[in-house]
Amino acid sequence: MIVTFLGTGSGAPTTRRNVSGIGLRFLQAGKWWLFDCGEGTQHQLLRAPMKISQLDKIFITHLHGDHLYGLIGLLASRSLRNTEPTPLELYGPPGLDRYFRGIMEASPVHLQYPLEIKIVSEGVIYEDEEIVVSCRMAKHRVPSFAYAVMEKEKTGAFQVERAKQAGVPSGPLFGALKRGEQVTLEDGRVLDGKDFVGEPQPGRKIVFSGDTEPSQAVLELAKGADLLVHEATYAHHDKELATRSGHSTAREAAQIAKEAGVKELCLTHFSPRYEDEDGDFSMEDLLAEAQQIFPATQLADDLGSISVKRERSDGRKP
């Protein structure tokens, strides 16, 4: 799983940072998901390692323009770039469906693929054989949701040599053991497939906070995550601005990461006021503020990526 940042700024784009958009790639599945779609997201995709034709799902955290205004253009471009009409699912807060219908009534776009809009509420909003997506209400000026993407535990590898040494013949019995079933050999021995499977591999967990003040709900959602992507619009000396606008400081995001017990924290959604390297407070200072509380912190950059690898049961990367 690879997280790629398409926009890491807040409010409006700058020469260095576009507004919010984050891609999550599933390499083996050949698909990817998008979290928020600020204006200019499809332009960023032209320089990113994702194809719009392989976009499978979009998750909108809330209906502020810097997280939403690129959506209609991207949906239209997906029609032009898709040779096959693969379906697309769009998840988001109440009002997203009305927003979409209003745009379509004023400026109709004929989509060449099925689009399903799903209005979310707290809890599990998507599940398949490998992935569960859940959300919690964050703390912002408008309804805003944080999303958690969790892989299910992966069955351990089948121990082929051990099965052969136990005298299991190739064929149906071998296959039954691989499925974890019990089998009876010709000599009467009963073998349990569970004894021939290695330790299960824990699934990965990635959490996207969206826009939020420090939130107990987001903290609970993030518990044990491999990666927490949390907004840090302001430095802590601008705490009053953060509170007034419904945002977090870098220090507050780091405290959330620490209390949630996450492995890594990546900060995003930065105010442009810290971009001036000659100013009183720089992005490096913002990072240092967070690292004082949670050392495993990094800053997101446009078109930068973070690879989240699956850990083995012994805690090591495979």
Curated annotation (Swiss-Prot):
It is an enzyme of class 3 (hydrolase). Belongs to the RNase Z family. Binds 2 Zn(2+) ions. The active site is at D66. Zn(2+) 1 binds at H62, H64, H140, D211. Zinc phosphodiesterase, which displays some tRNA 3'-processing endonuclease activity. Probably involved in tRNA maturation, by removing a 3'-trailer from precursor tRNA. The lineage of its organism: Bacteria, Bacillati, Bacillota, Bacilli, Bacillales. SUPFAM superfamilies: Metallo-hydrolase/oxidoreductase. The gene is rnz. InterPro entries: Metallo-B-lactamas, RibonucZ/Hydroxyglut_hydro, RNase_Z/BN. Signal peptide: none annotated. Zn(2+) 2 binds at D66, H67, D211, H269. Keywords: Endonuclease, Hydrolase, Metal-binding, Nuclease, tRNA processing, Zinc. Homodimer. Pfam families: Lactamase_B_2. Gene3D superfamilies: Ribonuclease Z/Hydroxyacylglutathione hydrolase-like. This is Ribonuclease Z. It catalyses: Endonucleolytic cleavage of RNA, removing extra 3' nucleotides from tRNA precursor, generating 3' termini of tRNAs. A 3'-hydroxy group is left at the tRNA terminus and a 5'-phosphoryl group is left at the trailer molecule. Its EC number is 3.1.26.11.
